[in-house]
Amino acid sequence: MANIRKTHPLAKIINNSFIDLPTPPNISAWWNFGSLLGICLILQILTGLFLAMHYTSDTTTAFSSVTHICRDVNYGWIIRYMHANGASMFFICLYMHMGRGLYYGSYTFTETWNVGIILLFTIMATAFMGYVLPWGQMSFWGATVITNLLSAVPYVGNDLVQWIWGGFSVDKATLTRFFALHFILPFVALALAAVHLLFLHETGSNNPSGIPSDSDKIPFHPYYTIKDILGALLLILTLMLLVLFSPDLLGDPDNYIPANPLSTPPHIKPEWYFLFAYAILRSIPNKLGGVLALILSILILAIIPLLHTSSQRGMMFRPISQCLFWLLVADLLTLTWIGGQPVEHPYIIIGQLASILYFMILLVLMPITSIIENHILKW
């Protein structure tokens, strides 16, 4: 009798994706983040589902319902904090995963890379709308400021903003639609993740050397399943340490004040994982220019495959490019810091310089460096 794992229509798909999948023998821990992202997504959907059972998307009761979850629902506090900090873990894994793709040239799998960018936008939209739901001060004002950016769109801007708000300000209609979209988008992300994997398994995984490994592959199970389980345990350990010891470490204290349209917080800022983009937005003293820079800071990833000028795939054997990559990481950390600071000297100029450097590294310095390295190799 044939092995059911290899013959059953459904089991066959799982087998070819997670068990008998031919995998390069030399992929490092940087390749763990894909599976960790899958775990994060499932964890967020499960905790979110239980939160949605008790949450009410009405401006008068939203804040109270979150308080009720934390105080009265059995283990509601841990579900709420796992969901909030799970989002932070999600973005940490996401940025690591993208960094790995940039460093090792995984963007040359253009279909996989482009689906990944769409996934990133989906998850960013989901996280933004989730931040609005507790209906605290930062929720309300964050929603007001970020949705208001759409008014910079020529001709239709104001109509677009009012259409998204469902009125003339962020109110009950906005909260209700944000809850509906926040609930549905993770399932869209789940479907996109399946497409992401589908495209990846068409080409097979990249590896640190960037050299094709078709002649030397090992099965995914047991070698990488055990490695992924170790990664998952470390992820859950980190998450639970965060949840149980300092659940509000990454949150904003202002969100414990109920939303008040008559009182503006001294410093409106999004969650920490959006601060780099927020800093780029603020670094341009023009509304439309800032919005364009904000969108381009993410969309720039789509043209990375076109800017690949190196004769080698990854950066493993390209020390000058490695220096530039880590400069980019440092620049993004600087932007994240600036995004959380008030708009005053010297933060304004630091933010502007860091924003210029971000685009310079990706659009100019990296392609030129790759060409120089190609010539050095021929000496």
Curated annotation (Swiss-Prot):
It comes from the Eukaryota. Keywords: Electron transport, Heme, Iron, Membrane, Metal-binding, Mitochondrion, Mitochondrion inner membrane, Respiratory chain, Transmembrane, Transmembrane helix, Transport, Ubiquinone. SUPFAM superfamilies: a domain/subunit of cytochrome bc1 complex (Ubiquinol-cytochrome c reductase) (SSF81648), Transmembrane di-heme cytochromes (SSF81342). Heme b b566 binds at residues 97, 196. Signal peptide: none annotated. Binds 2 heme b groups non-covalently. The chain crosses the membrane at residues 33-53, 77-98, 113-133, 178-198, 226-246, 288-308, 320-340, 347-367. It is a multi-pass membrane protein. Heme b b562 binds at residues 83, 182. A ubiquinone binds at residue 201. It is found in: Mitochondrion inner membrane. Its cofactor is heme b. The cytochrome bc1 complex contains 11 subunits: 3 respiratory subunits (MT-CYB, CYC1 and UQCRFS1), 2 core proteins (UQCRC1 and UQCRC2) and 6 low-molecular weight proteins (UQCRH/QCR6, UQCRB/QCR7, UQCRQ/QCR8, UQCR10/QCR9, UQCR11/QCR10 and a cleavage product of UQCRFS1). This cytochrome bc1 complex then forms a dimer. Component of the ubiquinol-cytochrome c reductase complex (complex III or cytochrome b-c1 complex) that is part of the mitochondrial respiratory chain. The b-c1 complex mediates electron transfer from ubiquinol to cytochrome c. Contributes to the generation of a proton gradient across the mitochondrial membrane that is then used for ATP synthesis. Belongs to the cytochrome b family. Heme 1 (or BL or b562) is low-potential and absorbs at about 562 nm, and heme 2 (or BH or b566) is high-potential and absorbs at about 566 nm. This is Cytochrome b. It comes from Mirounga angustirostris. The gene is MT-CYB.
